[in-house]
Amino acid sequence: MTKIEKTVNLMKEENTYRRYEDGDSKYSDFSKQIFNEDKSHKCPTYIHKTPPCQGSCPSGEDIRGWLQIVRGIEKAPEGMSMSEYAFRRSTSANPFPSQMGRVCPAPCQSGCNRNEVDDYVGINAVEQFIGDKAFKEKYKFDAAPELNKERVAIIGGGPAGLSAAYQLRKMGYASTIFEEREKLGGMMRYGIPNYRTPRDILDAEINRILELGDIEVVLNKRVGKDIPMEEVENSHDAVLWTIGCWNGKSLPIEGSDAPNCLSGVAFLEAFCQGRLKVGSKKVVCVGGGDTSIDVVSVARRLGHISNLNPQESPEAVVHGYVAQDVSESAIKEGANVTLTSLFQKEEMTAAEQEVNDAVHEGVTIINGVLPIKVEKDESGRAVALIIAECKFEDNKPIAIEGTEQRLEADLIVSAIGQSPDIEGLESLGNDKGFFDVDDFYRHKTKEGHFVAGDIIRPHLLTTAIGQGSIASQSIKSFFDNKDFKRRPKVDVHHFNLLDKLRETDLEPETYTAPIENPDKQRGTDTSGAVIHNYEDRSAQEIIPSTELFLGHFKHEERVKRGEAVPTGDEVIDHYEDRIIGLSEEDAIKEASRCMSCGMCFECDNCVIYCPQDAVFRVKKDVATMGRYVDTDYDKCIGCHICADVCPTGYIKMGLGE
């Protein structure tokens, strides 16, 4: 039986409930039309597009790339392990895989096309595996190139500044990081609790960047106060501002000026610095985002101590910049912690898992309420927060009369947003204190100055990392005196087939036109000087689920990470890492759920179903990622079956148009 006959038999239908007028009890056999009459001038070509996970990633990681490495489809160079190769692919965009694998809210997973089949791919979980494996194996970055003559001043040692220093050094530029705090890390260190971003791993990921060399660090110095801006300008060839937003917004209601009304930013910084070791008995936090969840989770862990010295109260610690001197023998009791949010639970901006963990730890969450007033006692201290149910009119919350509630509080924390602190740098800010930039992250009014991170607009850590990377590229263009070209529509890191061919010693030859018998070479399919039958649209197009053959993918449960979330009775002083990372076996299993949107993942469908035997596997000694199959155009009739059964949308009909 021929291959066509086998395929025809597979497509023939069994008896149906309906009998046609001629008495035939079977559907008509369309195989002849499909295999012999559905011809066209169009032939398959291989189109590389960006998957939506990468298009949704603010730091611009080649997510599909390192997932394919972990699952074993894209092979590591000889002598390099899978985990190290995945680490190098991941950190080409983001030098903090372990941190982002833990705390990033993962917009990539929301955009994952696998959501149309069963559930998103656990991208964060696999990224954490990559980062933690790199930490255990002590992977280092490749040696940096020789230095260029220019040097960059980076003001701020948080995720944006560190990302920029890393990318600049890979391009041959030295930098000086000016950080006003005692350690690098920014919000990763001073805004997120240690049980979410383990400090030993954070230190390792920062030191890995500094070990590239020629990245000078100046700590405990604030530019604009301790160091004049002019001095920095005169000693550097460009300046990058990555100073973040360190002022928390206070509640815009009566009584919020009470001394025991704090911002979430200040509360978390005092805790992360180790100065705040015990909290208050009754804590109320207003928010709904990730910062507010960190506040209430920390408050539950701190607990409270009866008869605490007023000079060591949380507000005294925050306002006075002193540390609590709490005896280890002091008996801590549980704190009554409440979080209020304008929005219903499903509308809160905090990560769903973080919200659920907070509830598991004993936090009470009241949704759909608006803070009305802070009630004070005779001394001026806050004793309660008055809230009311609310509704939205013209996108503004309006309190509903008669629904007021009184929440007793010893400490009220506002986690409703952040604003810049630009004391000494007022000339650089707009009327709200933020720095205005153009599309290339150049400061709009200051030549040679660039900006990245929250000082533009408060957003995610991954956003700051991505902006730092793009700003570093703009700085290079500035040094090269080149025109600033328009950024790609899909502005992320992409798989590059030419680079892959070079890596495997398969780089195309130099083209030489045939002198004799020029007709002998009819097209590029027989030329070793070009990548035949391939088009890279990754910088312009994101492939939607509608371009995939979703029927290929069977239902597979997501491999979830374990958690060590304490109960309300266990939460006091519980500072262990809550997330239990995937084993290598589970990481491979979860990475294998990736549908490889926009790139061949070697399923063989096109080879199996081609009725003309026109599609064939490329010989192993010249095959690589993206060049697994090819087409014999002497056999191809343009029937489009290969494109129809391609699960990843990599094959398109159109060559010859």
Predicted regions and their residues:
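FAD-site-proximal beta/loop scaffold in flavoenzymes
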Residues: 259-283, 289, 301-304, 374, ...
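Beta1-alpha1 glycine-rich phosphate/pyrophosphate-binding loop at the start
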Residues: 29, 61-78, 116, 120-124, ...
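Extended, hydrophobic alpha-helical segments in both membrane/secreted and soluble proteins
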Residues: 159-164, 285, 291-295, 323-326, ...
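Beta1/beta-strand and adjacent pyrophosphate-binding region of the FAD-binding site
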Residues: 147-160, 279-289
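Feature captures the FAD/FMN-dependent oxidoreductase FAD-binding
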Residues: 146-147, 151-153, 203-254, 373-386, ...
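Short acidic loop-to-helix transition motifs that present clustered carboxylates
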Residues: 222-226, 267-270, 345, 372
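Ferredoxin-type iron-sulfur electron-transfer modules and their immediate structural context
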Residues: 1-151, 199, 241-257, 377-380, ...
